[in-house]
């Protein structure tokens, strides 16, 4: 099976220049592909696919425009991957799965340096370093995290990315699938929410990490840093003496705080999923939440976004497939919170402010725990 490993790297100054040059070229090619297809559309011509654009770029455009020779100085695999990503963006737009593709902006868009294993000497990994095509050996900050090549593991492909002044490598490694022992326990249901991140049907409650003093302190620092950055931009508009270098320094501070908060939230999700899977349930049932609809509520949108429900579902699906656990997804219209787990009566007048479920049969239970138990026992579901 293929598994991705992402860790921070410590490149040299020369390697940093190559990474910046490759990422900048990939961003330019992505935007050029979008612009070229827009021109063809305005001229009444047909859409150009990624393969056709790659042939046209190398055989017609670059020979006639020698001033763009720098495109050939970076890895061809990275350039082709940028074209494929742009073609995928158009394909999603044509199938009404996303909006029209937008240009990638420097410093704001997520662009990566893609690499692939072309020969046996490429993508070789040791305990403390990894060999990347066009970069050579790059030191790893977390030693031993990526499986070493000497142990028989093969890196198929990967990508180098930047975020908040740090450099990361993501490697797709071919590893043997773990063998399921078959000693599963009873199935569980998980109710996700804003008061608590997750409530499991066995009574386990995972707290909302965004309500901790640690996150609130970082968010307070972030607000101050953003106000400071905003004042620098305002002073620049007024013509006052504000250096661009100071703006870049303050922008990096804001990015680092964003990155720190994101890492804490992601780490919390990973730990929750790991703890749930280690109980070895026969099945896990979750609800198909309407995240896009919840985000339209301006009073709840920030809280919903900070919980990262979609990331939780994606990682839980991967982990369940890895350990042979069945992941069940219940329809979003299933009234898990309104059904009494004792007598199956539906309480239609249940409000969002009612945190305790009280049924006419005498059953009294926490609202989220009652919903988790109903999800566990749901009979209509889809296997993810």
Language-model segments: which ranges?
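Acidic carboxylate diad motif detector
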Residues: 52-166
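Gly/serine-rich nucleotide phosphate-binding loop at the start of the catalytic core
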Residues: 1-80
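Stable alpha-helical structural segments in soluble proteins, enriched in small hydrophobic residues
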Residues: 33, 82-93, 369-383
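Positively charged, helix-rich recognition surfaces that bind polyanionic ligands
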Residues: 3, 148-151, 163-384
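Surface-exposed helix-capping loop/turn segments at secondary-structure junctions
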Residues: 38-42, 94-100, 282, 320-327
């Amino acid at each position: 099976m293929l598994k991705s490993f992402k860790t921070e790297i410590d490149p040299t100054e020369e390697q940093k220049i190559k990474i910046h040059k490759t990422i900048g070229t990939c961003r330019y090619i992505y935007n050029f592909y979008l612009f070229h297809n827009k021109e063809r559309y305005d001229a009444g011509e047909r859409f150009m696919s990624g393969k056709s654009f790659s042939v046209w770029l190398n055989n017609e455009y670059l020979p006639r425009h020698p001033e763009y020779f720098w495109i050939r100085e970076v890895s061809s695999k990275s350039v082709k991957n940028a074209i494929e990503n742009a073609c995928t963006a158009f394909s999603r737009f044509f199938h009404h799965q996303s909006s029209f593709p937008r240009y990638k902006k420097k410093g704001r868009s997520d662009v990566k340096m893609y690499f692939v294993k072309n020969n046996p000497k490429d993508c070789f990994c040791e305990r403390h370093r990894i060999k990347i095509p066009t970069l050579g050996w790059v030191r790893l900050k977390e030693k031993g995290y990526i499986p070493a090549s000497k142990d028989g593991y093969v890196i198929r492909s990967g990508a180098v990315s930047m975020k908040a002044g740090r450099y990361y490598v993501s490697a797709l490694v071919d590893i043997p699938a773990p063998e399921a022992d078959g000693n599963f326990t009873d199935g569980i249901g998980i109710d996700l929410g804003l008061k608590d991140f997750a409530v499991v049907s066995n009574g386990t409650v995972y707290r909302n990490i965004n309500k901790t003093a640690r996150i609130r302190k970082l968010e307070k620092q972030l607000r101050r840093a953003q106000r400071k950055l905003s004042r620098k931009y305002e002073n620049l508009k007024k013509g006052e003496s504000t250096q661009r270098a100071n703006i870049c320094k303050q922008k990096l501070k804001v990015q680092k705080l964003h990155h720190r908060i994101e890492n804490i939230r992601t780490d919390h999700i990973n730990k929750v999923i790991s703890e749930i899977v280690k109980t070895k349930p026969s099945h896990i049932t979750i609800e198909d939440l309407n995240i896009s609809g919840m985000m339209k509520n301006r009073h709840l949108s920030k809280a919903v976004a900070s919980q990262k429900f979609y990331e939780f579902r994606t990682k839980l699906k991967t982990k369940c497939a890895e350990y042979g656990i069945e992941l069940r997804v219940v329809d979003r219209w299933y009234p898990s919170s309104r059904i009494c787990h004792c007598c199956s009566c539906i309480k239609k007048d249940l409000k969002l402010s009612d945190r305790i479920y009280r049924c006419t049969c005498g059953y009294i239970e926490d609202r989220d725990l009652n919903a988790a138990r109903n999800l566990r026992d749901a009979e209509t579901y889809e296997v993810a």
